[in-house]
Amino acid sequence: MPKSEIRKLLQEIKKQVDEPGNSSATEIKKMASEAGINEQTAEEIYQLLTEFYQAVEEHGGIEKYMHSNISWLKIELELLSACYQIAILEDMKVLDISEMLSLNDLRIFPKTPSQLQNTYYKLKKELIQVEDIPKYKPGRKRKTQKNTKKEKTNIFGKVVPAEFKAPTSIKEQISYDKSREKNLVDLLSGVKSNVQLLSENQGEENNVYDLLKSIYSLSSLAVQKEELDKKYQDLQTKYQELEQENSYLKQQNETMTDSFHTLVLQVADFAYASDLDQIQALPLFSQQLVVTLNQLGVFKENYKQM
C-alpha cells in the first residue's frame, strides 16, 4: 500500500473524530478494507484518537494541554505507537511518518516531527513507559520516605557524623545524653590530670604550654573540617540544582529551535506560493502560525508588549 493510501486513511479517521456521525465506524472500515488494512486495526486507531481528543478536552482544550505540566498522555503514547506500526508495516520511513502525523501535515498530534520521532524511539527502546509523562522542571526534589536518614560524606568519601543538637531546656541539659556527658567528663578529667602532673615538675612549663597549644590546634582543625564538610555538601547541592536547570534549559532550547524552524518553513511555504495558493491556504496558514507562535511563547494577549 503506497504512502498516499495510509495518509488518506489516517486523514479520514481524523475527519470522523472531528466530525463524528452515525456511520463513522462504517466509513473507516470500508476505507481500511479498500486499502488492504485490517479493519480492526483501523477501528482501534479511531477509538484511540477519539479517547485522546476527549482527554485533551478534559484538560481544557488543545492550547491549555500544550502548555500544561504534562508532556505526553498515556492514551497519546498508545495512539502514537499504533500509528507508527501501521505505517512501518507498509515500508514508510520513520522520518516521513513523523512529518505526516505532526503539526506540519495531518495534525493528529499537537507535536513537532522531532518530538514524535524522539518519543517513538524512546518507546521502542523501552526508555519510557506507556503512561502519563510530566514535563521536566528544575529545582524539584523527590520526596523521600519519612524517617529515612541520608548519610553525608566529606571530600575524602568518609561518613560525616550527624550534627549534634544542643539541648534547649534545663530538663534536656540534665538528661539529654548521659553516656555522651560521661565520656566528655572523663576526657576532660584526664587532660586536667596530665596538666597537673606536668605542672608539679619544675621546668615543665613549656611542656604544659605545648600540650595545651596542641589541643587548641587540633580542636581548631576539627572545627575547620566541619565547616569544609558543610561547604562541600552545600556546593554539591548547588551543583545538582544547576545541572538540573541546565538540562531543562537545553530541552527548552531544543523545543524552541524546532518551533522556530517550523515557523520559518510555514512562512516560506506561504510566501513563495502562487497568489491563488496563498488565498486558498490563508485560513490554514493563519491557524498553523498561531499554534507555532504559541509554542514560542507569543500569544494574542502579550505580543504587543514584547
Curated annotation (Swiss-Prot):
Record has Coiled coil as a keyword: no
GO cellular component, one term: cytoplasm
Entry keyword set: Cytoplasm, DNA-binding, Repressor, Transcription, Transcription regulation
Function text: Transcriptional repressor of flagellar motility genes, such as flaA, during extracellular growth at 37 degrees Celsius. Binds directly to gene promoter region and probably prevents RNA polymerase binding. At low temperatures, MogR repression activity is modulated by the DegU response regulator in an unknown mechanism.
Protein name: Motility gene repressor MogR
One GO MF term attached to the UniProt entry: DNA binding
Subcellular location: Cytoplasm
Database matches in Gene3D superfamilies: Motility repressor MogR, DNA-binding domain
Keyword NADP: no
InterPro entries for the chain: MogR_DNA-bd (IPR021009), MogR_DNA-bd_sf (IPR038245)
Coiled-coil stretches noted in the UniProt entry, renumbered to this chain: none
Pfam families: MogR_DNAbind (PF12181)
